Amino acid sequence: MKKKINNIILKIDKFFYRKFKSDKSTKVLENIKEAKKIFSYINVPGEEDKIKFVGGCVRKAMTGEFIDDIDLATSFEPKDIKLKLSNKDIKIIDTGIEHGTITAILNKKKFEITSLRSDISTDGRHANVQFTSDWNKDATRRDFTINAIYSDIQGRVFDPFNGKSDLLDGKIVFIGSAEERIQEDY
């Protein structure tokens, strides 16, 4: 267990030695034209957003870093996402369909799209999941507060665990039990 914790601390140290620019906002995400297109195919006008940016791309937008990896979360199940994106100019790959993840490729840009989930049971990195439409349940299964920050295409943030504050303060805060989260990742 001590070795696992030390490995995580090394990764965290590398991450936090970067200089943060806290004046940046998630508004930059709306400038990613391929993301705009995906959002337009999935969201229903006049309804609550069904898809949001999540995790590293939101963190990087907040800190002014280059966004090289885009993860999206959606309240639709994978079969519904595949249907909504079919017959469009998007290539779809079943990356981890049993866990709710597909990869959408548009103009050579990859977007991992994962359905909102809650854990039924876990055994280390292997989890039996249930799809949900509850953003809070999905956030609860994430490892750190800084990875549970969501943003819609307009840059409006959903941050149920105050991850932005932790990010700007240079803190890594586990969601739930730190020991359980470490066991889940190894």
Please report, for each region that a protein language model flagged, where it lies by residue.
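Catalytic cores of the polymerase beta-like nucleotidyltransferase superfamily
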Residues: 1-186
